[in-house]
Amino acid sequence: MSKRIIQSVLSVSVLASMMSMAFAAQNEQEQAEQTLEKPAEPVKLETIFVTAEEQVKQSLGVSVITKEDLEKLPVRNDISDYVRRMPGVNLTGNSATGQRGNNRQIDIRGMGPENTLILVDGKPINSRNSVRYGWKGERDTRGDSNWVPAEAIESIEVLRGPAAARYGSGAAGGVVNIITKKVTNETHGSVEFYTSQPEDSKEGSSNRVGFNVSGPLIKDVLSYRLYGNYNKTEADDVDINKSIGSTAAGREGVKNKDISGRLAWQATDQQTVLLDISSSKQGNIYSGDSQLNANAEADAILSQLIGKETNTMYRDSYALTHEGDWSWGKSKLVAQYDKTHNKRLPEGLAGSVEGKINNLDDKATSRLETLRFNGEANIPFEYYLPQVLTVGTEWVEDRFKDNVSTTQGKDSSGSGYGDQLAKGDRSKMESRIASAYIEDNLKVTDSTDVVLGLRFDDHSKSGSNWSPSLNITQKLNDYFTLKGGVAKAYKAPNMYQNAEGYLLSTNGNGCPANIESRCLLQGNGDLKPETSVNKELGIQFQKDIVNASLTWFRNDYKDKIVAGTHVVGTVDGSSTNANTGAVTNTKWNILRWENTPKALIQGFEGSLGLDFGDIRWTNNFTYMMDSKDKQTGNPLSLVPIYTINSIFDYDITDQLDVNFVFTQYGRQKSRQFAENRLESGIGSGGANSALKPSTVKSYSTAGINVGYKFSDQISTRVGVSNLFDKQILRDSNSISQTYNEPGRAYYASLKYSF
């Protein structure tokens, strides 16, 4: 990155800060004068002060989950249980391989979890980046959607397509913004207990307890908020999938511990300072999973680990926020420091044992540190048209150290092929992104709103990127509104893809079909960033009790980063026979991560909501027309061809309510085309190992629950999930049926509020 760019970005940040402070001294006097001389002006200003971000969140590609929604359909542990019910959202892996199938994460519009950005109160979380990135693009992680307990959440915003592009790298599919409960000027709080008990004794149960409390330390000046959570979800039995002849593991368990505090200081009527500190621990309960479905019961090492904690994530976050509400507009400054320690047993890095735990020694720890600064100002004014201008800058720096995943090809003499390909300390990686953005929300007419945006990102290795955007809202009449948008989204290479010291190897089966043996996959510091031109166009109808919409979306995905198929060189290496001690000298073919030309995502989303007051019925659907890597012909991820969600909510009395939920998943087709020698039928397994395309048939799940309020303080809820017991079992011989859908379970919660 050039020094000039860095200096420019930092200069704008400093200037924004100085402007905020300079205007602060004049603010109270100016507001008083405006109130006396022009009393109508503040009211007028308030009515048009809608920022570009707020306006874009009115797009059809945006859904909001409220705290009441989470109370009426409680999640077992992870908010992904509820987010998956939104249009365009599914749970899947980051590729169409089905690897790590039971570690499904939030996928938006088929772009994969790596293109879904998780935010907490608008601040990104990237702890999953500390987990090793596999040959096919998978990580052994549950993602970043489980760092905030449901009890602490005020709402969840799910942004899809063009609406998400403003958030920068990693939001090409969409954004999930978890908004926590605010501090209060009166003491309020709650404690909730939740349990879920499966009918099938081989499935893991779940129990959690959480609390949230907030109140003043100094009335009207200093307030606090504190929340905490403990959850334990047991692992499935190691033999849960044996009934269909599969050795694949079931879902692993998880133990969560979370604590978070906030101090809010109302420094003046115009200025608020927030201090956020949180600490979390997530540990797994091992159930036998490995990247390539090894038989855990037959493996000497894996069989000893069943039921134990093989990986633990520790996450600490510190953030300081200044919010200003001035006579000229609003400002926000954020400084954030996140630290993730990923402690886990070492895994293989070669061929058929990639991703499989290979010893019982002490866990190794990789360390990820992220420093983030963001400054933003929103300025309303009128120049030909009423408008609100947004200007902002951002600086993100990641420093990462992984001593275990960067050891392939290393030997004590320093002459291994890994040592030849990458000199120095291979374990250290880093990344920096400097960004600046400008947006303008224009009120063209009473019925027309236009939001223009332009974002610039400069990455320390992949260079610069410009991301323009346009969103339009046009009211056609009292009932119909046309909404559309187009934006260029962006994703920088991850640190493993960029690191020349990160090597994976295969003796032949994992090589491209045209390479007979011995392939090395090496990180590439010359990768381009991934980009996607995201478009959507839809119509909304609102009248009386009806709210309906239909939206077409299309993502033209370019330069997706994948494992390379072209030999860029060779390197000398050697291997030692463990039985005879004989040394064999070999040559390895070097592949590198590379940008694949194009991919296409396209489909429709629709919704229909009926609100009768005490009765509410909300429905949505997603239909995937296209999901294809144009180079391989395979889908980008494993998602149903269609999904239908329906929630029926009836408040029978002020104390009693009942909820019914139904989801229908369409067929899920696997990859159709081989991508290596083994799948092509020319590897060591011959034709028996050739890729066998498969399909998960359409299926549905349903649930029901009843809630009752004993008083303003005490409430309870009991229910049944997967009411008709449609259980899906993971099949190690299938490349589409790659996950477990749990069967019928009974759950209950008890909440005390004060």
Swiss-Prot record:
Chain ranges of the TBDR plug domain: 54-181
Keywords, comma-separated and alphabetical: Cell outer membrane, Disulfide bond, Ion transport, Iron, Iron transport, Membrane, Porin, Receptor, Signal, TonB box, Transmembrane, Transmembrane beta strand, Transport
Classification via SUPFAM superfamilies: Porins
A Pfam family it matches: Plug
Ranges where the TBDR beta-barrel domain occurs: 186-754
Disruption phenotype: Deletion decreases sensitivity to siderophore-beta-lactam drug conjugates.
NCBIfam families per record: PRK13524.1, PRK13528.1, TonB-siderophor
PANTHER family reported in the protein's UniProt record: TONB-DEPENDENT OUTER MEMBRANE RECEPTOR, TONB-DEPENDENT SIDEROPHORE RECEPTOR PROTEIN
Protein's job: Probably involved in the initial step of iron uptake by binding iron chelating siderophores, thereby allowing extraction of iron from the environment. May bind the siderophore, ferric enterobactin, with micromolar affinity.
Name of the protein in its database record: Probable TonB-dependent siderophore receptor PirA
Organism per entry: Acinetobacter baumannii (strain ATCC 19606 / DSM 30007 / JCM 6841 / CCUG 19606 / CIP 70.34 / NBRC 109757 / NCIMB 12457 / NCTC 12156 / 81)
Recorded name of the encoding gene: pirA
